[in-house]
């Protein structure tokens, strides 16, 4: 059978009521926490996936394709030097906890201080989180995750969109405003220049996120 999660369909094992076995995807629906995630994730037999949680509901999604993986890698290399100058650290996917029953695994993140081996990163330690948008994550990356990150008080949210068929690359850097919502701080398309002094100096053409 299949369980519908977020905007995709991920094959999972039959429910516990059919087999008599404990199935965390069924039994823990709506009550997931980091403690339960530490105990039951990853799900045995599942393909490699990202596990995120919104208000106790587990969201399972496949890992990114090569276009987004490369874009995230390039963002890491571009941000690492200026972020380190401020004492910050840049990371690929982390478990960023946004509440007692909320967490995300952003494609990249900048923390105010080194993680030093931590598995769960409090949202208060994140200066910036970034997502590379894919067709299956468009709603989550544009609406759901920014709303949760804003509520958690993360000052910056970066959205990256790349397409090789359209030769398109776009970066939108959002900053938390006075009313608790994100506002556009900087934005650029391939062929233009993204330039910002905050949260640290960046100046580059988004086309650099596309492999040549």
Question: PLM features: what roles do these ranges have?
Answer:
Residues 1-212:
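Gly/Pro/Ser/Thr-rich low-complexity, intrinsically disordered segments predominantly at protein N-termini
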């Amino acid at each position: 059978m299949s369980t519908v999660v977020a905007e995709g369909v991920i094959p999972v094992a039959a429910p516990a009521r059919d087999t008599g076995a404990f199935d965390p995807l069924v039994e823990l629906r709506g009550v997931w926490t980091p403690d339960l995630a530490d105990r039951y994730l990853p799900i045995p037999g599942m393909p490699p996936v990202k596990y995120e949680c919104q208000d106790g509901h587990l969201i399972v999604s496949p890992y990114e394709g090569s276009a987004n993986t490369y874009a995230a890698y390039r963002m890491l290399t571009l941000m690492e030097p200026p972020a380190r100058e401020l004492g910050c650290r840049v990371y690929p996917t982390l478990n960023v906890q946004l509440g007692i029953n909320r967490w995300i695994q952003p494609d990249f993140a900048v923390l105010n201080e080194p993680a030093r081996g931590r598995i769960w990163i409090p949202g208060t330690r994140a200066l910036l989180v970034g997502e590379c948008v894919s067709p299956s994550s468009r709603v989550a990356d544009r609406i759901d995750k920014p709303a949760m990150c804003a509520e958690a008080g993360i000052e910056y949210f970066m959205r990256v969109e790349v397409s090789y068929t359209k030769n398109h690359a776009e970066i939108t850097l959002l900053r938390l405003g006075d009313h608790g919502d994100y506002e556009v701080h900087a934005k650029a398309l391939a062929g233009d220049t993204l330039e910002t002094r905050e949260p640290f100096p960046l100046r580059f053409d988004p086309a650099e996120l596309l492999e040549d």
